[in-house]
Curated annotation (Swiss-Prot):
Its main location: cytoplasm. Its EC number is 2.8.4.3. Belongs to the methylthiotransferase family. MiaB subfamily. It comes from Neisseria gonorrhoeae (strain ATCC 700825 / FA 1090). The gene is miaB. This is tRNA-2-methylthio-N(6)-dimethylallyladenosine synthase. Catalyzes the methylthiolation of N6-(dimethylallyl)adenosine (i(6)A), leading to the formation of 2-methylthio-N6-(dimethylallyl)adenosine (ms(2)i(6)A) at position 37 in tRNAs that read codons beginning with uridine. SMART domains: Elp3 (SM00729). [4Fe-4S] cluster 2 binds at C157, C161, C164. It is found in: Cytoplasm.
Length: 442
């Protein structure tokens, strides 16, 4: 049985793709063993991210660490997948000639053949084409062990934000046909999955073809998935404010299985910066979406993404971002220092903000966000939360970890038979990034 080591960088789409890589290899070899140490593997895969510069360089650092393994075992297969693979292509082989296969997100289904071609010819294989929906046509049926699962409904992005490499590494937006998505979800429900997370670079751009040739939009998809037997909770990530329509907002009013959590990246509170980023909305328009959502789902948990130090960002514009964060009171958010990505329009903009100032802005924004997160968590003490038990706690192997409807992690004492089940937990303690709870006896 082939032993496979895989390291995944970046977004949840990459996590989904990594699972699919393991699936196609398992189907090819009649099963595989996933190992946690690279030196135990027959196949080593790095599923990469190019959104941040440090993530990209970390890949080459990791490749350097596995090079001695290749020297000891020439039959070892080393592969680079994901967005760095799409962006760099043949350059990866030039920089690390011991790499055997390089493939992009849309060609992961070809991995087994690429390995065979490498072993037959002795030549490294590179395939970073964009065959779009073909990828999903060649993937084996989803198999999961947990109570929650990701389902990719679309890939790529056509928004071309000035700072982002995704359109260049994953291609333009394309949607899976409606029936394909529903079949996968129904199959997962039959395996005991209770929570579905609909996945895409911009899920609210979903336009899936139906059997009659008509197009199903994202709001309609949510309503259909809501009726699939066995599915108790629905999430989605990631969405774009530009296409967050009233019909999607109304789903939060009408669909109780749609959880009270939304990740909606805004990136900045400054209209000038948003325009330079080519985001396609203003801070006021973003606030209007949030206002409508909270009017119909007051307990909605909101998270977002922010970039500080974008080229030309002034102190006043950063203060506008701080004010927006305070006004909206996000439950949680992720802040990044801008890093120019090769080939993007923003990479050509003059950037005269000192790195030390960017770090200061990062820390100042995180301080405000974390204070609000801690405050909201404190308000949950004493409440009873319906939770999906995900598995063993990452903090304490003697405890279990569950997730609330509003995406909070709760650690508690329980028994293994509770894993993948929905249970009620009373919140007893609150920390900045997690909660502690106890089982509510029936």
């Amino acid at each position: 049985m082939k032993k496979v080591f895989i390291r995944t960088f970046g977004c949840q789409m990459n996590e989904y793709d990594s699972e699919k890589m393991l699936s196609v290899l398992a189907e090819e070899h009649g099963g595989i063993e996933q190992v946690t140490q690279a030196d135990e593997a027959d196949i080593i895969l790095f599923n990469t991210c190019s959104v941040r510069e440090k993530a990209q360089e970390k890949v080459f650092s990791d490749l350097g660490r596995v090079r001695p393994l290749k020297e000891k075992n020439p039959g070892l297969i080393i592969g680079v997948a994901g967005c760095v693979a799409s962006q760099e292509g043949e350059n990866i082989i030039k920089r690390a000639p011991y790499v055997d296969v390089v493939f992009g997100p849309q060609t992961l289904h070809r991995l087994p053949k690429m390995i065979v071609d490498k072993e037959t010819s002795g030549l490294s294989q590179v395939d970073i084409s964009f065959p779009e929906i073909e990828k999903f046509d060649h993937l084996p049926p989803a198999r999961v062990e947990g109570g929650a699962a990701f389902v990719s409904i679309m890939e790529g992005c056509s928004k071309y934000c000035s700072f982002c490499v995704v359109p260049y590494t994953r291609g333009e937006e394309f949607s899976r046909p409606l029936n394909d998505v529903l079949t996968e979800i129904a199959n997962l429900a039959q395996q005991g999955v209770k929570e579905i997370n609909l996945l895409g670079q911009n899920v609210n751009a979903y336009r899936g073809e139906m059997d009659d040739g008509e197009i199903c939009d994202f709001a309609t998809l949510l309503r259909i998935v809501h009726e699939i037997p066995g599915i108790e909770r629905m999430r989605f990530t990631t969405s774009h404010p530009r296409e967050f329509t009233d019909s999607i907002i109304e789903c939060y009013r009408d669909l109780p299985k749609l959880v009270s959590h939304l990740h909606l990246p805004i990136q900045s509170g400054s209209d000038r910066v948003l325009s330079a980023m080519k985001r396609g909305y203003t801070a006021l328009e973003y606030k209007s979406i949030i206002r409508k959502l909270r009017a119909i789902r007051p307990d909605l948990c909101l998270s977002s993404d922010f970039i500080v130090g974008f080229p030309g960002e002034t102190e006043r514009e950063f203060e506008q971002t701080l004010k927006l964060v305070k006004d909206i009171a996000f439950d949680l958010s992720f802040v990044f220092i801008y890093s120019p990505r090769p080939g993007t329009p923003a990479a050509n903009l003059p950037d005269d903000t000192p790195h030390e100032e960017k770090v200061r802005r990062l820390e100042a924004l995180n301080e405000v966000i974390e204070a609000e997160t801690a405050r909201i968590n404190q308000t949950m003490i004493g409440t009873v939360q319906r939770c999906l038990v995900e598995g063993i706690s990452k903090k304490d192997p003697d405890q279990l970890q569950a997730r609330t409807v509003n995406n909070r992690v709760v650690n508690f004492t329980g028994t293994p038979d509770m894993i993948n089940q929905m249970i009620d937990l009373e919140i007893t303690e609150a920390y900045t990034f997690s909660l502690r709870g106890k089982i509510v006896e029936a």
